[in-house]
């Protein structure tokens, strides 16, 4: 039995070395993705500094993603879902930073406050805040696609009054809850 110990230990050591060597490139790729995401985050803050300073937009660095939160007032008229020219210009400045290599998945989520839909919107087929938020998210997604973003890499979801970021008891809180969030996973994902 003792004559088999050396080859066993040698084999196990060799396998362990191979496994460790295989981890190094993965760590390097992960660091490259993190660095690319950090660069995008910094670019967004520089490019959108006016909107961020005016509290129209918030840019958040997550662990493996960037989230851009845009107040609905910047994008849509009250109760509406068609983007203004200013909104198109704003989203147009974000697109080259969020989707430079057309490899990153972009999720567009629409949110509303909890104020019930009025009769005018009901006549237009908007039966709930969920439907309104879906239309808004889809409008932003369609605009992004019209600007060259790969349709396979962008999705839209309306979440209505779910996940409020502020109290719906005040006009300021309701304004904060009416938003669109664009979340992009790390570059190259």
Give residue ranges: language-model regions.
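Periplasmic OmpA-like peptidoglycan-binding domain that tethers envelope proteins to the cell wall
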Residues: 111-189
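Bacterial N-terminal signal peptides that target proteins for export
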Residues: 2-13
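C-terminal motif of bacterial Sec signal peptides marking the signal peptidase cleavage site
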Residues: 18-22
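Extracytoplasmic
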Residues: 52-54, 63-65, 69-71, 93, ...
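Short, solvent-exposed beta-strand/turn patches at coil↔beta or beta↔helix junctions
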Residues: 63-92, 113-127
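Post-signal peptide N-terminal segment of mature Sec-exported envelope proteins
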Residues: 29-60
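Periplasmic peptidoglycan-binding/anchoring modules of Gram-negative envelope and division proteins
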Residues: 46-54, 79-110, 114-116, 141-145, ...
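Bacterial signal peptide processing site
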Residues: 24-27
């Amino acid at each position: 039995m003792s004559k088999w110990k050396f080859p066993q230990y040698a084999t196990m050591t060799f396998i362990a070395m191979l496994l460790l060597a295989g981890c190094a490139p993965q760590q390097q790729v992960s660091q490259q993705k993190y660095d690319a995401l950090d660069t995008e985050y910094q670019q967004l803050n520089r490019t959108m500094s006016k909107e961020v300073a005016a509290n129209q937009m918030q840019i958040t660095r997550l662990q493996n993603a960037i989230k851009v939160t845009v107040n609905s007032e910047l994008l849509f008229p009250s109760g509406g879902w068609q983007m203004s020219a200013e909104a198109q210009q704003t989203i147009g400045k974000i697109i080259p930073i969020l989707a430079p290599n057309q490899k990153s998945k972009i999720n567009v989520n629409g949110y509303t406050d909890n104020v019930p839909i009025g009769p005018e919107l009901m006549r237009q087929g908007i039966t709930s805040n969920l439907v309104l938020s879906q239309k808004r998210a889809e409008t932003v997604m369609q605009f992004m696609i019209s600007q060259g973003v790969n349709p396979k890499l962008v999705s839209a979801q309306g979440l209505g009054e779910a996940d409020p970021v502020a109290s719906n008891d005040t006009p300021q809180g309701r304004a904060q809850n009416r938003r669109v969030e664009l979340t992009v996973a790390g570059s190259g994902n």
